[in-house]
Amino acid sequence: MFSIYQIKDAYKLIRSNINKTPILFSDKINYLTKSNIIFKAENLQKTGSFKIRGALNFIGQSKNQDFVAPSSGNHAQGVAAAAKLYNKNSTLVMPSDAPLSKIQGVKSYGGNIIFYDRYKEDRVKIAKKISLEKGYDFIPPYDHKDIILGQGTLGLEVLDQLKDIDFVPDTVLCCCGGGGLISGLSIALKSQWNNLNIHPVEPEFWDDTKISLKEKKRHIITNKKSSICDALLSETPGELTFRINKKLLSFGISVTDQQAMEAIHVAYEYLKLVLEPGGAVALAAALNYSEVVKNKNVLVILSGGNIDKKIFLNSLKTKIKKL
């Protein structure tokens, strides 16, 4: 298990290259959910998601000049941006159906993209082959100490921000793909509030962490269905991340694509924020699982905002509760 002190060391390394993203609240969303919610708006981070934190921490400690990473899009942008900040080179293995906004983002940071078929090929195997053949450093999306500690810096910021407003959460809702963000976040938050309930939120049919927590072992998703939450389509939890998460997390929650789209609409309507589907699942859980949030102080992590315009406009057509 890693410590808050290691996360503090990571923060010292990366803080000059990241945004300290704001915390926000909405009386209207509190009314809808009958709870008291604080939002961490990590969609306002550089590259549009939390992923740059881990990438900066990893690359900042490596002596290599070249890096390769498998990614659905946000990790790719984080790695490309971090490599550029350190004047290094990046190659990203991305699905051919990745959102255009994420592809354009990677290219804007100078990343070299290699596309693969999400449903037929293994991006990790492709990236590791490149690493072996060319001597590039392989940067995993979540299952590595430096990635976890880098993502944990988000939790370190939250500790500081909530202290300033005297807010003590009862419950935390955070997206979960491979588990890198929520494991680092949990280490940070549990250093202050050991009895905190932290729930991973995943897309329906891709709830491998939810099932793994129930079964007390890593579950593998075999029936791969499509989902609009492209950033969270992990078929099994990371080995390292799950060792942490099975000790620190409460039960998992899954949300539908429709609920994620409605949450994007709610975020735009009441927070004036733009979220991507995977970045909105924690809000979707708050809106749809009253038994988890009602009459509680809740921290909701809004993890990313890299959404294609067409999907965003479609989200605004969904029906949401108006006040």
Question: What spans do the regions from the language model cover?
Answer:
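PLP-dependent amino-acid enzyme catalytic core
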Residues: 1-323
